[in-house]
């Protein structure tokens, strides 16, 4: 969930995702399989009223359009939609993207993806020792505008979850002993992002 930036009127636009169901490789009646992004415009005078609109969905373009939108970052002019494509749908035709939805034009396009280097043996020995070849084995996590924090315009951070990057050194990272996950991850800085 995130809201549009830029003005009080814009701030009443709230965007959120319905990631989609991942329990099956086939659609389930009454549910979105590939995922959706909605816009809720809150009424300026009545907080109990508003208008809900579907702005992006993947069910009409299975495997080529959006796949399991999970996180969202909204600026004044764009909605950045981060995919969590590790549902491993057999019809998926691309790895996880960050999509850029233009609020004014109402268009959605792939904006960023990760290079898995699946044919590079040395790379895979380090970052994909299990030789996972299905699309979506890496996902994008949260994306946040940090321009105002660091004083550099159009600068964002993005979390990356490469599920194939596993090492014993990553085990028990929080020290609790409760989690057996040993996946690595990164937070990266991206500059010159359109706002």
Q: How should these model regions be labeled?
A:
Residues 2-195:
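Sequence/structural signature of beta-propeller domains
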């Amino acid at each position: 969930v995130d809201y549009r930036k830029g003005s009080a009127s814009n701030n009443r636009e709230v965007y959120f995702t319905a990631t989609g169901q991942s329990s099956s490789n086939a659609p389930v009646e009454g549910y979105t399989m590939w995922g959706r992004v909605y816009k809720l415009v809150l009424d300026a005078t009545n907080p109990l009223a508003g208008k809900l609109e579907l702005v992006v969905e993947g069910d009409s373009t299975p495997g080529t359009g959006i796949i399991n939108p999970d996180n969202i970052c909204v600026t004044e002019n764009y909605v950045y939609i981060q995919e969590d494509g590790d549902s491993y749908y057999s019809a998926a035709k691309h790895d996880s993207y960050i999509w850029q939805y233009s609020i004014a034009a109402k268009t959605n396009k792939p904006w960023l993806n990760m290079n898995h280097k699946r044919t590079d043996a040395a790379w895979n020995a380090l970052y994909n020792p299990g030789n996972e070849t299905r699309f979506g084995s890496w996902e994008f996590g949260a994306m946040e505008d940090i321009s105002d924090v660091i004083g550099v315009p159009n600068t964002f951070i993005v979390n990356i979850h490469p599920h194939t990057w596993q090492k014993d050194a990553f085990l028990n990272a929080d020290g609790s002993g409760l989690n057996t996950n040993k996946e690595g991850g990164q937070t990266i800085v991206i500059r010159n992002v359109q706002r």
